[in-house]
Amino acid sequence: MNPILINRLQRKLGYTFQQYELLLQALTHRSASSKHNERLEFLGDSILSFVIANALYDRFPKVDEGDMSRMRATLVRGNTLAEIAREFELGECLRLGPGELKSGGFRRESILADTVEALIGGIFLDSDILNIERLILNWYQTRLDEISPGDKQKDPKTRLQEFLQGRHLPLPTYLVVQVRGEAHDQEFTIHCQVSGFSESVIGTGSSRRKAEQAAAEQALKKLELE
C-alpha cells in the first residue's frame, strides 16, 4: 500500500490505527484476498446503526420511532456511505482483485459503502466504542444537523409511488436488465419506466431492491426538473 495514501486516509478519518493489519484488512475486498473485510463490515454496520440511532434519539425527543427509523435509514444507506467514502478519497486506498480493478470497483458505490463500515469495525477493535462513536458523529455532523423528520425521509420508491398516485398516474414498472459479478458481489441494473417519460431511468445497486431505489431516485430528480 502507498504510505502517502494511507497517511492521507488516516488524517481524513481523524484516526491513526495502532494495529496496522486491521486497517489493511478493512481496505481489502473479497476479490483480493481470503483475509477480506466482510467480518469487519458486519461489525461496523451494527455499530453505525447504534451510534446513529442513539444520536437521533437524543436530538429528537418528541419524534416517533417511525420517523426516527426513516431518518436512520437515510443516514446509513449505501449512497450516503459512498458519499462519505468519496470525502475520504477512499477509492484510491482499496485493495481489489484484478477483475474488480478492471471493472472500476474502486468507484462502485456498494464497495465504497461496505469499506466505510469495515473501517468502523476496524477502528472499534483497534480502540473502543467511545472512540468510534466520537469519530462517526464527527463524520456525520453536517448530515445530522441538516436532517429532519417528515415525508422526505421516505424511501425513493415510496415517494415516487405517492407522487404518481397523487396525480392519478399509473405506477412505475421496474425491470432487471443486467446482473453482473459473482453471487457474493453482484451489481444489478434496473430500468424504471414512468408514465410520461420517453425513456426509462436507470439505477444500479448491490441488490435488486437497492437498484430499484436508485432508479426511483433518478425518476424523482427528473420529475422535479419537469
From Swiss-Prot:
UniProt EC number: 3.1.26.3
Domain RNase III: 6-128
GO molecular function terms attached to this record: double-stranded RNA binding; metal ion binding; ribonuclease III activity; rRNA binding
Reactions the enzyme catalyzes: Endonucleolytic cleavage to 5'-phosphomonoester
Iron is among the record's keywords: no
GO biological process, one term: rRNA processing
Pfam family, one: dsrm
InterPro entries on file: dsRBD_dom, RNase_III, RNase_III_dom, RNase_III_sf
This protein's record includes keyword Ribonucleoprotein: no
GO cellular component: cytoplasm
UniProt cross-references to HAMAP family, sorted A to Z: RNase_III
Database matches in NCBIfam families: RNaseIII (TIGR02191)
Name this protein carries in UniProt: Ribonuclease 3
